[in-house]
Amino acid sequence: MLASLASAQQVTKTVHKKAVKTDMVTTGTLTIRKPDYVCIATDGDKDLLIMDGTKFTMTMGGKQHVTDSRKNPQFATFHSVLKAVINHQPIPAGEELTTTRSGGLTTITIIPAGKKRQLFTSFVLTVDAKTLAFRTLRMNGRNEDYTEYTFK
């Protein structure tokens, strides 16, 4: 499916915690609408990651975090990348951003400059180089912890 259509894709979410022996795996859906709406719902809609314009809402384990990309530089870059992919536009250049291509995939890595008090140390989005369909989104935390979404 093209990422630019109002569409739903299946998603598998893997939460890896270094201190826990077994990864937590749940499934759900990814919904995308132009120009800049993304909703990843997993675990029976208990866990949500929503980008609605510049507003990001993340609900995990009953805790909700809300931020606005206009006030949070880490999410400003993430927002501009997602919006570009959804709308089939060039990925914006930036100091915190690297883009690589390999095997028909484009990998976009965002490493925030100011790592103090950030929820994540980096974001890694992999998309199909031709269709720009989302393939994976990995949000790396501290201590080798991460949350990874795999899209089908």
What are these model-derived regions, one by one?
Residues 1-29, 33-37, 45:
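N-terminal leader/targeting segments and the immediate start of mature chains
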Residues 6-8, 50-54, 131-134:
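A short, compositionally biased
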Residues 9-17, 23-24, 59-119:
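Flexible, processing/modification-adjacent segments and terminal tails
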Residues 13, 38-42, 56-59, 108-110, ...:
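Short hydrophobic/aromatic-rich beta-strand segments that constitute the beta-sheet cores
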Residues 25-27, 35, 44, 53, ...:
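Extracytoplasmic
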Residues 29-31, 39, 45-50, 98, ...:
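Short linear motifs in intrinsically disordered
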Residues 30-80, 147:
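An acidic-aromatic
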Residues 99-152:
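Gly/Pro-enriched, hydrophobic low-complexity segments
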